[in-house]
């Protein structure tokens, strides 16, 4: 026979090699833009300072949802522009001013480059614009936004010096402190910077269960994620979920689950449907679910269940704090998320599967789990 089987195999292998290389190149390329984009950060180290600063600002915008990824920051910025360009502008101004202030105060450079000195001011700028009673494009508002953004690195540094003793993050406590201070100092009747009037509930809400809309409930899931940035547009919430997904699929999953649990909590307390549809029950629980479900605790099925419990607890705490703080005319912000999640992180247990990540090692859930498994392996092999 003239046929050479060996030659045929070699020929087939030669034709398949480029396809195999293509399949290998795709995951490698995705590796450069997913996670925390560490390779990109290393590449920027010898580049112009202005380019590095843009990277820090974009990471700061995305750090609100525990993501340190400039591309995710761009996507989130796009989502903010879809929602309201004025809010997006205030958020950017806050992030830039806060990052510059941290540089002037000689704060930890690694925290600045990771965006950890910008994210609180992102929320400060956005929420100050939302609660302003002057409406959009009241340009004088940029002055108090800049002033309050300058306080964020101060609050962060002070809180970190205390919380670091327990190896705890500051979360969005600086944002809550800055926003509460500003709104309580100005109020609804301030002649220069009036804020939206917030009043406690004084009557029984009209909740008619047959009017409950399944479509609106479905929309409220991405809206709950969007409300982390004060956005009530479902498309914006979807963009935010995409930005989180780019960095970490596990974070995206927990963000969606947390928002869903917030909806369930709202329905269980017969909350006004308008509040549930607007995502007001979902954003704190979404943040809590992300934080416990793999970010500040290594992801196991035990910590996954703990994240679900924390999300529900946060939603109910949010309802409680909203009623209490409305008495003094203030929003609850992300106080419920901060307090509930810090409480869960202080949990002590002898279960090795509930592993709290050292703050210095926290990145994103997939990488955190690898660190946890390696640490556990070293612990097992240590005595040998």
Curated annotation (Swiss-Prot):
Q: Where is this region: Disordered?
A: 1-22
Pfam families reported for this sequence: UT (PF03253)
For whether the record's keyword set contains Transport, the answer is yes
According to the record, glycans are attached at 206
Q: Name one GO biological process term.
A: establishment of localization in cell
List locations, semicolon-separated. Answer: Cell membrane; Basolateral cell membrane
Q: GO CC terms for this protein?
A: basolateral plasma membrane; plasma membrane
User: At what residues does the UniProt record annotate the site feature described as Important for channel permeability?
Assistant: 334
Per UniProt, the keywords (alphabetical) are: Cell membrane, Glycoprotein, Membrane, Transmembrane, Transmembrane helix, Transport
Activity: how regulated: The rate of urea conduction is increased by hypotonic stress.
Q: What is the effect of changing residue 334 to S?
A: No effect on urea channel activity
Q: What does this protein do?
A: Mediates the transport of urea driven by a concentration gradient across the cell membrane. Mediates the transport of urea across the cell membranes of erythrocytes and the renal inner medullary collecting duct which is critical to the urinary concentrating mechanism. Facilitates water transport in erythrocytes.
Please give the subunit comment from the record. Homotrimer; each subunit contains a pore through which urea permeates. Identified in a complex with STOM.
The record ties this protein, via PANTHER family, to: UREA TRANSPORTER, UREA TRANSPORTER 1
Q: What is the official name of this protein in its record?
A: Urea transporter 1
Source species of the chain: Bos taurus (Bovine)
